Swiss-Prot record:
The lineage of its organism: Eukaryota, Viridiplantae, Streptophyta, Embryophyta, Tracheophyta. The chain crosses the membrane at residues 462-478, 485-501. This is Flavonoid 8-hydroxylase 2, chloroplastic. It is found in: Plastid, Chloroplast membrane; Cytoplasm. GO terms for cellular component: chloroplast; chloroplast membrane; cytoplasm. One of its GO terms (molecular function) is 2 iron, 2 sulfur cluster binding. A motif (Redox-active motif) lies at residues 447-450. The gene is F8H-2. Its cofactor is [2Fe-2S] cluster.
Length: 519
């Protein structure tokens, strides 16, 4: 499992064909740098091990397991949503590690709250409700209202002079989860037991200083994908798939074709993986350092310098003595589905993001997601009932991080996400390609930038169609041939522009699809 540098999203943002036009190519945003204390880590060149290899290559060292060294999936913070995509005027529904939650802004406490997405009355989803005029979360099924602590404050159907039924514990929201905001992301602790009420004081979500550093620029993207957490994580850690699965999307260094080198430029990768323990692992690739902090975080810091002589086409181009960060928050949603929050930060070309709308950047991000989406969806189903280590042939060092992640998952994570018997082992059936490549519900509807852009461009499309009709009417009303021809030409141009815009809107915000054969 290769680290973040190989991640498709990261490449799309940072990769430039040449360093001189890095700023001009705004659609490929870059990444910032993470402050990590230097550690004396014993790094070993990682080689994957499979039963079919005659001479097993060297393996990363796994720290001997202690009795308590088992990863606890429900004793960690989980990212729910990026703050930039949340609207304080309404509640938002999300599913994280199988738990349906509602995120809403409590204006009395000036804080984001995370509740179980269930009204105690008739179990309707609170995320379909609203924030009332007093700042309470209101269930729109029967109007019950709740404060930031989950206490019921109003039951419209209760007699005004009768017993205060809203004060009953049964009227309170059953799950009020600890929550916080860190690095521009709302987090929650997936256990509503009162003993975890102040868990933030003793255990905090992993912090990346560069995401809050004003000298860095950062762009965030969120996308839900139709494959599970395990497949998502290993794909992000796999740099060698980038020149192939994302061919024609990312601008990679050009390589000279030869008998042993194809047009895509794939080549041998030297990846060194450090010790693996319950807290994850680190890895090194040329001028990039990567870190896996389970269960959700995988990030890399790319810091080239004049001493770096090796060229790696799987790494984004970063100016010398500058830093780029690629940060991935991998969120298990339910079996067969996961969510990714990607943050790309950098301390160069900072002004670009101030002039380029976020939805423009998301166009290329979503195209990267689409380009390997079907591959990963099918791969997950083929691996479902197989032993990964015995079924996959992994003879090269390029898959070092992928193997390291699988070893961590088997050794400490129980081989898969702990769903607590909330789901059956079976994966959901494969939907149609149209549904698989859906962008609207997996991204646009929940993205503050893309949703607004979609509405405005739809309005522009309608405006162009109306203009076409107006020009036709004007052409019929005038008698001068030259003026009539001009009106007809304008009507045709307006109609063609509306058709082009309609196709652009559909491919950008609703459904794009992908066919590798003709790229």
């Amino acid at each position: 499992m290769e680290v973040l540098q190989a991640s498709s999203l990261s490449f799309q943002l940072l990769r430039r064909h040449s360093r001189n036009n890095l700023i001009n190519k705004f659609r490929n945003p870059s990444l910032p740098r993470i402050h990590m204390p230097r550690q004396n880590i014993d790094l070993k060149t990682f080689a994957a091990i499979t039963p079919t290899v005659a001479c097993p290559p060297s393996e990363p060292e796994i720290i001997p397991e202690k009795k308590e060294d088992k990863f606890e999936w429900y004793e960690n913070w989980y990212p729910v949503a990026s703050v930039c995509d949340l609207d304080k005027r309404r509640p938002h529904g999300r599913k994280v590690i199988g738990i349906d939650v509602v995120v809403w802004w409590d204006r009395k406490e000036n804080a984001w709250k995370v509740f179980d997405d269930t009204c105690p009355h008739r179990l309707a989803p609170l995320s379909e409700g609203r924030i009332d005029q007093w700042g309470r979360l209101q269930c729109v099924y029967h109007g019950w209202c709740f404060d930031g602590a989950g206490a019921c404050k109003f039951i419209p159907q209760a007699p005004h002079h009768g017993p205060p039924v809203e004060t009953s514990k049964k009227a309170c929201v059953k799950g009020v989860y600890p929550s916080c905001v860190r690095n521009g992301i709302v987090w929650f602790w997936p256990n509503s037991d009162p003993k975890y009420k102040d868990i933030f004081l003793t255990k905090k979500p992993h912090y990346i200083p560069e995401l809050d550093d004003p000298s860095f620029t950062c762009t965030m993207t969120t996308r839900e994908v139709p494959y599970g957490y395990e497949i998502l994580a290993e794909n992000l850690m796999d740099p060698s798939h980038v020149p192939y699965a994302h061919y024609g999307i990312l601008e990679l260094e050009k390589v000279k074709e030869s008998a042993k080198r194809d047009r895509e430029g794939g080549h041998e990768l030297e990846i060194r993986v450090g010790k693996i323990d319950v807290n994850g692992f680190s890895a090194k690739q040329v001028s990039a350092d990567y870190y896996f902090v389970p269960p959700y975080l995988y990030y890399g810091r790319i810091t080239p310098n004049t001493a770096t002589k090796a060229i790696d086409v799987t790494l984004p181009v970063v100016p010398e003595e500058k830093t780029a960060m690629i940060i991935f928050y991998c969120i298990p949603v339910r079996p067969g589905y996961s969510r990714l929050i990607f943050a790309g930060a950098r301390n160069f070309a900072v002004q670009v993001d101030r002039f380029v709308p976020r939805w423009i950047t998301h166009m290329s991000h979503n195209l990267i997601f689409d380009s390997d989406l079907f591959l990963l969806h099918v791969e997950e189903r083929k691996l479902k009932d197989l032993d990964w280590h015995k079924s996959c042939y992994i003879p090269t060092k390029a898959d070092g991080q992928v193997v390291a992640f699988r070893r961590w998952l088997n050794k400490y994570g129980g081989t898969q996400v702990d769903w607590r018997n909330n789901f059956t082992p079976a994966l959901p059936p494969t939907p149609s390609r149209e549904q698989l490549f859906d962008r609207y519900w997996s991204h646009t509807a929940e993205c503050s930038s893309c949703s607004v852009a979609c509405k405005r461009l739809n309005a522009l499309e309608i405006g162009l169609q109306a203009m076409s009709l107006v020009f036709v009417a004007m052409a019929a009303a005038v008698s001068a041939p030259a003026t009539r021809y001009s009106m007809v030409a304008m009507a045709v141009l307006s109609f063609l522009a509306s058709k082009w815009l309609s196709r652009f809107i559909h491919k950008t915000f609703y459904n794009h699809g992908y066919d590798h054969a003709f790229i």
